[in-house]
Amino acid sequence: VASLEAFLRGRLCTAGATAAALTAAAHTLAACARRPWPLLDAEADARTASPAQRDAARTQGRLLLRVARRVWPSPVLDELAGAVPSPHHPLALGAAAHAAGATSEEAALAAAYHAVAGPATAAVRLLGLDPVDVHGVLAGLAPDLAAAARTPHPADWAALPAGAAPALDLLAEAHARAQTRMFVS
């Protein structure tokens, strides 16, 4: 469990911080009169080195956007779907959070949590770790998750974080080509 905690902390500082910032940017963009969704989506592309990770993020974003449009009908969500039919997950999450009435910080917190909860769940399933121990690790990350959500997010999208984990990118590419696939993300 100690190595899982170290992994999750590293993930939160890289992919989690990037996803939180992109989600907050999407939430902010959703409140604007002019919404250049394709430009923000390109920023997400630029921060996701692995094509397999980009495909997974777009699949998750498309599916989330589909559900969000039914649960929280909104012109903003319709506009995002028209501009970017398969947006990166953080864009869909930020826009959906806006449509649901959540704050930018709440949206960023959801993105940060998503970045660590998925791998934590996979560790329980694939490594046979005790779920109570793993959830204890997640609970211990709460202050760091809150800090990631509170981090000021620059208005200049080029200045958004771009934390990377090259080893995970390589694993994602190998997994995408594997005959037996366990997860998409």
Predicted regions span which residues?
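Electropositive phosphate-/nucleotide-binding environments in soluble metabolic enzymes
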Residues: 17, 51-54, 58, 87, ...
